Amino acid sequence: MADASTSQPRVEDLPIPLERDVFLRTLIRELAGTLQDVVGLEEASGFVSVVGQRVGDQINAAYKAALGVESLSKSEVADVLVDLKRRIQGDFYVLSQDDEAIIFGNRACPFGEKVIGRPSMCMMTSNVFGVIAAENLGYAKVSLEATIAEGAPGCRVVVYLKPTTESEAAPGREYFQG
C-alpha cells in the first residue's frame, strides 16, 4: 500500500485485465498449448476429448432433468446445443437441420481470443455436441469444418445424425449411445 506522500498507485487500483474468466480461459489455453507442444496435436485433442465427454455427460443430464424428459428430441438437441454455448458466451446458431445432420455456425468462441492457435480446445465442442446428440439420438459424428482456433472468422460445425456416404467421407469423430 502506498502512503499519502507518494504518487504510486495502490496495487488493487492497477488496470490489470485479470478476473476469473480471463484467468480460467488463459489456464485452459496454456494447458492445451503445453499438451500440443509436448505430445502433439492429435494426443492433446484426445486428452481434451476425455474432458469434453465428461462435461457433455453432465450438461446432457442437467438439460434432461430441467426439461423433465428421459431423452431429447432432434429439435431439442439443436436447441440445447445452441443454448449451452450461449450460456458460456459462444454465439452458435443453426444454419440448417434435417434427418441426417444439424449444421451450426458460430460467431464467437466461449474461449474468446484464447482459442486462437489451439485447435485441440475445439475438442470440447466436438465432444459436448457429440455426446449430447448420440446419447439422445443414438449416433453422432461431429465435423469441425471451420474453426476460429485455426484462423477462420467463425466456426462451422456439422453434427451428422446417421451414417451416410457424406458423413463417412467427412473428417470428424463418431459418438455412440451408451
Positions of PLM-derived features:
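N-terminal accessory segment detector
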Residues: 1-102, 108-124, 134-135, 139-178
